[in-house]
Amino acid sequence: MPYTVTIRVGPRITRTRHEELRDAIDSLEVQLTTLGPAARRETRKALTREYSPADQVSARGELSGPSRLRPRVQAGADVRGDGSIEVYRGKVRRAPIAVEPGERPFEALRRTLGA
């Protein structure tokens, strides 16, 4: 069974399948880093609270596989409204992955998943 990459940008959802974990992470990186201005958000107000662009998730990419029933890999990345990217492990309980100095977020994801 292949790895599945799911990209969510607003109401739009796209899914791609990849045979290798390395290819799936590469696809996730390309799709999320090429969003450019579409990922930017302005400060929003809701009732009495204000949400800065860094507090808003403008796009989410999820990686799972190789099986659908009990996938061995569940990870992903959030693109924040200020353009920053945060990678994580898990699906329901997301645990952020620490990015070491001089390391890009997707390099940290590759290191953590062993790809």
Task: Name these PLM-found stretches.
Residues 11-23:
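A short, exposed loop/beta-hairpin motif centered on an aromatic-Gly-Thr core
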Residues 37-115:
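Short, mixed-charge low-complexity intrinsically disordered segments
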Residues 20-36:
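A short, charged, amphipathic alpha-helix used as a generic interaction element across diverse proteins
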Residues 1-13:
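Short aromatic-glycine-(Arg/Gly/Cys) micro-motifs in beta-strand/loop hairpins
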